[in-house]
Swiss-Prot record:
GO terms for cellular component: large ribosomal subunit. Belongs to the universal ribosomal protein uL10 family. Forms part of the ribosomal stalk, playing a central role in the interaction of the ribosome with GTP-bound translation factors. The lineage of its organism: Bacteria, Pseudomonadati, Pseudomonadota, Gammaproteobacteria, Enterobacterales. This is Large ribosomal subunit protein uL10. The gene is rplJ. It comes from Citrobacter koseri (strain ATCC BAA-895 / CDC 4225-83 / SGSC4696). GO terms for biological process: translation.
Length: 165
């Protein structure tokens, strides 16, 4: 489908606006994946706060110019599906990783987080980032565990002191 200049400018403006507020971006190749599967992926993405769009590579290069996602430029080869995580940095990576397990033809190319290019082989680094709630829960568990251990050591020291006296 041919796009006129206004359509191209509108696409670049829309995706650029999304990129400004995004926490991370993941690029994938969806050749060979059925429309039904892609519809399921898009639905799951909307629920997870992930903006997804298939955009021409030349337009994507304009979109990422001057953003933390500029490191992705070299991955814009062939059909490109880009996903921006809007609420949690690992949301798009987690979504694409799970989808790729079930769909062999879906290939994650790379991701970008805080200006760093993350190759597809290391996408787990981004996908396994804990959510804010998970991080708080882990921190609280660690703090609780540390204070309980300290209490046990203190009680043991008191007991030892009484036995020595």
């Amino acid at each position: 489908m041919a796009l006129n200049l206004q359509d191209k400018q509108a696409i670049v403006a829309e995706v650029s606006e999304v990129a400004k507020g995004a926490l991370s971006a993941v690029v994938a190749d969806s050749r060979g994946v059925t429309v039904d599967k892609m519809t399921e992926l898009r639905k799951a993405g909307r629920e997870a706060g992930v903006y997804m769009r298939v955009v021409r590579n030349t337009l994507l290069r304009r979109v990422v110019e001057g953003t933390p996602f500029e490191c992705l430029k070299d991955t814009f080869v062939g059909p490109t599906l880009i996903a921006y995580s809007m609420e949690h940095p690992g949301a798009a990576a987690r979504l694409f990783k799970e989808f790729a397990k079930a769909n062999a033809k879906f290939e994650v190319k790379a991701a970008a987080f805080e200006g760093e290019l993350i190759p597809a082989s290391q996408i787990d680094r981004l996908a396994t980032l804990p959510t804010y709630e998970e991080a708080i829960a882990r921190l609280m568990a660690t703090m609780k565990e540390a204070s309980a251990g300290k209490l046990v050591r203190t009680l043991a020291a008191v007991r030892d002191a009484k036995e020595a006296a």
